[in-house]
Amino acid sequence: MKQFLSLFLMMMAFQTASSQNIQLHYDFGRNLYPDEEATRQKVTATLEQYKADDWGSWYYFVDLDLSRKETLGAYTEISREFNVSKKLPLAVHVEYDGGLGSRTGSYQQAALAGIAYNGYTPTFSSTWSVQLLYKRFFKSYDFNTAYNSLQLTGVWGVHFFNHKMSFSGFVDFWRGQKANGHGQLVILSEPQLWYNITNHFSIGSEVEISNNFIYNTVNDKSFFVNPTLGVKWNF
């Protein structure tokens, strides 16, 4: 859930800026696709933090997928950016993605490195980032292999109605790999819309839109739209 990053790219203009939030989402995916997503989580808890410093910024999030009886999985992305120049909105971006599932073992881990172009409007009401990254998937269990990939990422955040509403999200495009070793384009986007009741508490929704991302053994369907209903607390 990289949405949080877009809302705090503006902090790169200041030193030692930091912010953190926690989100709780009820997921309707299993209701919409009872066969294809029969094992999908109902609830996801997310912790995110962004911190800017003299060299650039740190960012991470942790997703916990929950059921009534257990934690189904934990997934994290942690990234570091090093500013190229104070006069240029460019940064060197390095990242690690991975996690563990209680039923499936580890997620396929990946390391990423590349360049990021970050920007914001003069009033800081809109922020954006475009990243072009080399991506290396590692062999995580018996049924997959290590391979090289390329990822293009866009991240955005917009405040409007006097900061009462926030629209943020990301979209990723990368080369995935089928079981037969052939490549495929994977698309994943998670836009969020929040109504900010106070400076700390928000209610809203996230919609996970994907193609060739969800592992489906029931049929040949590859495109899914999974909405949530969520609450967020900004520390």
Spans of model-derived segments:
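Repeated loop/turn-to-beta-strand initiation elements of outer-membrane beta-barrel proteins
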Residues: 22, 55-59, 86-92, 121-128, ...
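Membrane-embedded beta-strands of outer-membrane beta-barrel proteins
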Residues: 47, 76-78, 113-115, 152-156, ...
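Outer-membrane beta-barrel transmembrane domain signature
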Residues: 135-202, 208-213, 233-235
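Short glycine/proline- and aromatic-enriched beta-strand/turn motifs that initiate or cap beta-hairpins
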Residues: 18-67
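Bacterial Sec-dependent N-terminal signal peptides
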Residues: 1-21
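Solvent-exposed loop/turn segments connecting transmembrane beta-strands
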Residues: 39-41, 65-74, 100-109, 138-149, ...
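Outer-membrane beta-barrel "beta-signal"
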Residues: 223-235
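Transmembrane beta-barrel strands of outer-membrane/channel proteins
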Residues: 24-28, 60-64, 94-96, 128-134, ...
